[in-house]
Structure formats: structure tokens, C-alpha cells
């Protein structure tokens, strides 16, 4: 998992960063890339039997189905980010901060590889509430807030 300086500068606090990292950890833990390649390969193999002029239709259908798999993986990664962070000192809904910031990009959800940001915030918040996770950082009085701000300044 790589964290780029632009992400650190973009986010407001360590819980937001922990939420994004937790989301990416879930992709690796749940083997989303491997699962998606297997699912798409199976569908493409099945659709290739159609043959003839229908080959283009089969390719387009395969791509649209792939988008749905990707959205499901994104939702699962959001859920596991909350589960991973719930027992920690970070807010379990830290990833929601990122989605609040980016807002809607205007792409219709059915053509996107990622679910709508507003839906993601709602799902993350629901998951946090269902698991009775903390609503606040457990280090707000500590040095980590200052350290995160100092890190952002150092990256300028």
C-alpha cells in the first residue's frame, strides 16, 4: 500500500488517513484484485462462446459487469475499514471524511468503478453505529493532532 504526499496534505487528520489506509488494507486482505480478475475472466470466457458480431456486445457486457464487481469490492472495503478501526484510537468512520471532501464527481454510478461518495458516507456511518464505535478520536488531547499538522507543513 502506497500513501502519496498529496493524500496526506488533502486530509485533515490522522483518523481520515487511517480510514483510507484501512480501506486499502481491506482490498488486499479480501483479495479483491484476484477475485475480480477471476470473475471477469470467467464472464469473458463465457461470453466469448457467443462469437460473431456479438463479440463486441459481449466485450461491453463484460466491462459493465466488471464495474459492478468493482463497486461491490469498494463497498466491502469501506465496511472492513470501519471494522479494522473500531477497536483503535482512531475514529472508525475516518474514511467517510475523504468521501465528504471529494463529493460527487458527476459520473453516473452505473458507469463508475466506485459507489457514489454520498452513499459511501451513509454506509460507513451506519456500519460505525451498528458496531457501537467511538464518534471521536481518543487522542484529541494528545500530540498526534499536532504531529499530523506538522507532517503536512513539512510536506509543503
Predicted regions located by residue number:
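A Zn2+-metalloprotease active-site environment signal
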Residues: 1-156
Amino acid at each position: 500500500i502506497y500513501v502519496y504526499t498529496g493524500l496526506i496534505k488533502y486530509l485533515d487528520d490522522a483518523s481520515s488517513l487511517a480510514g483510507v489506509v484501512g480501506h486499502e488494507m481491506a482490498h488486499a486482505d479480501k483479495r479483491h484484485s484476484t477475485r475480480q480478475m477471476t470473475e471477469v475472466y470467467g464472464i469473458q470466457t463465457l461470453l466469448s462462446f457467443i462469437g460473431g458480431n456479438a463479440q463486441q456486445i459481449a466485450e461491453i457486457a463484460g466491462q459493465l459487469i466488471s464495474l459492478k464487481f468493482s463497486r461491490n469490492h469498494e463497498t466491502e472495503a469501506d465496511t472492513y475499514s470501519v471494522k479494522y478501526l473500531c477497536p483503535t484510537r482512531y475514529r472508525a468512520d475516518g474514511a467517510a471524511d475523504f468521501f465528504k471532501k471529494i463529493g460527487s464527481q458527476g459520473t453516473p454510478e452505473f458507469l463508475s468503478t466506485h459507489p457514489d461518495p454520498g452513499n459511501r458516507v451513509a454506509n460507513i456511518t451506519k456500519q460505525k453505529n451498528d458496531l457501537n464505535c467511538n464518534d471521536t478520536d481518543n487522542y484529541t488531547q494528545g500530540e498526534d493532532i499536532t504531529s499530523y499538522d506538522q507532517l503536512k507543513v513539512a510536506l509543503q
